[in-house]
UniProtKB/Swiss-Prot annotation:
GO cellular component labels: mitochondrial matrix
This protein's name: Homoaconitase, mitochondrial
Residues where [4Fe-4S] cluster binds: 362, 422, 425
Organism: Cryptococcus neoformans var. neoformans serotype D (strain JEC21 / ATCC MYA-565)
Tree of life domain: Eukaryota
Amino acid sequence: MVAIPRLARLSVPAWALSARGRFYATVSTPQTLVEKIVQKYAVGLSEGVKVRAGDYVMIKPEHVMTHDNTGPVISKFLSLSCSKLDNPRQPVFALDHDVQNQSETNQKKYKKIQAFAKEHGVDFYPAGRGIGHQIIVEEGYAWPGKMVVASDSHSNHYGGVGCLGTAIVRTDAAGIWATGKFWWQIPRIVSVSLDGRLSPGVTGKDVIVALAGLFNKDEVLNAAIEFTGSGVEHLSIDERLTIANMTTEWGAVAGVFPVDDKLKEWYQGILRKAELRKFISPTVPSTVGAKVHPRLNAARLDDAMTNRVVADPGAHYAARLSLDLSTLVPHVSGPNSVKVATALPKLLDPPIPINKAYLVSCTNSRASDIASAAQVLRGKKVAPGVEFYIAAASSRVQEDAEAAGDWQTLIDAGAKTLPAGCGPCIGLGVGLLEKGEVGISATNRNYKGRMGSPDAIAYLASPAVVAASAAKGVICGPESMDLSQLPQYEQPKFSIIEEGAAGEEKPVEVDEASLEPLLEGFPAYFEGPLLFAPQDNLTTDGMYPGKYTYQDDITPERQAEVVMENYDPTFAATARELRTALPTASSPSTLPGAILLSGYNFGTGSSREQAATAIKNAGIPLVICGSFGDIFKRNSINNGLILIESPSLIKDMTERFAKDGVRNKGGKDGKLTVVPEGWRIKVDSQRGLVTVNMGEEEEKTYPAAKVGRSVQELWVNGGLEGFIRASL
């Protein structure tokens, strides 16, 4: 608990500068790699302000990719009365998910998207060209030191080439088309040091499978990861892409590798190939017949390598994780969970029979992956009773694999080919797992029902292990793998240091003169009684039951009546009582209203935006938690519900009011929602302070993340749609 005197200069603990408790940054504040990239793309900042983890910022990304979901984004864009794109060079359309679907309905949808791209001059890649994430890297949209977003959860993929990639929702994509920008809260940043060197037969896929299994207690949940360490230089770029891609399954919102000489050499190879081709976009006349690629060219590469973006010495990280690569053996993820990772040797006895094997997806279907599988299967056949499906990450990858002879090797072994696209990875098309079947895949997700029947079992592994398993009919490694030569450790060596919880309270000077002014119309203070739901991982279904989700005619008043129904049936009545008893605001700049407090990962689960609007309609203008689910956060702020993170406040509330001093058991009084009698809470929007008035007890003030200017802009315009209309 931190008591902060009300002085012109405030003294707070050093840990309050972490992702959830920072007040502001000064010119001299060291920045991480992620913060530096965001700094380049943040717009509307006051002069001299440096962004930090926890800040809400308005971002103008280099590019935004949409895939088959471009159709709904077009509908949202048109519903905003938009007639033209803010910057036609910013969006990229790549059709990749349902490419096996030749139905009239799907083909009509694809043609509509292509026509929209042609009308507005947007780069368009048709079905069969490849998976969007592969294309974004392959065609140079993702680039070292840049920031690229996509309406797909595996946008983390771009971090493999030193590009900050993160996912957005469809409404954000429409907003970017219209205004060129979107809001983002810079996540807490975790450093992951990969040390040593992998043994022969161990791959980048084994690295990320092991990381997700070893650090499976939400250590990187909703964080941005920066990979460092001596082992990075020994990882191929394809391996880095695999690792970055699956940081999504690990729980992170981004995973970025450094820009180094190995990346430079890789791009030089790409450029040599590019010189042999002409560059034709089917929708952009300016590139037709061009001799120099608009993105993949020597001048651009020289600029990226000369002006490399690197973290500052002394930059702050919420945590530091490490993994000794030299102690790692091949690992398998599952069954049906990426949080379960087992060393391959432990799965050999008793053998695990399989029915299907897959070498598909943006995770592991590049030319090097196909070559690895071909090396295992050369001269062999897929085992009787096993179906082995292959699909290249892109048509260009398939061309390279065909030229090398690897594609034909897999076909000769009995592999069944699929078009370049997502296919079985997303549970679409032929070859899905059926009830009772077991599959092993080089993809990124093995959640129950993801690749077919919910009554099937799915494992994840490297391309070599998948190919070997297809040949043997059981999960195994290649014949060339000598288990006795692998590192002999019970488990890989790893460690974690939580910097944010270090507890060393060095005073930090915060100058009032450096505070940014609030936008006109945004409340300087939020004030009112508090409700505390002592629960972690409170789902959106708990906030707004699924049975109401598709009642499109439901009123705001009715939403308020059912809010939190699945968590606490009495919550709505409690909130109504507090709302009707609210006193007059203490000042014109104060917005009165009950304030909801809860635990960590508040709003996990379904993406239903009614979870946010129901809370707001219940008269709760602001929610304070330890952390929030990322999609819930976006839905809330897009609809004008303010969210603030203050771990220290939640810690004290838990100790005082939660049963047994821990969350997830309800309150000490037996109620699921605690309303401390006589207590009031006041949030200072500009300073990032939360003051709790405990009735007859002393006031306590806690650090919290400030309400950023980007969030203020949305709020004063009534939400994202109002902001977009005001920006046109």
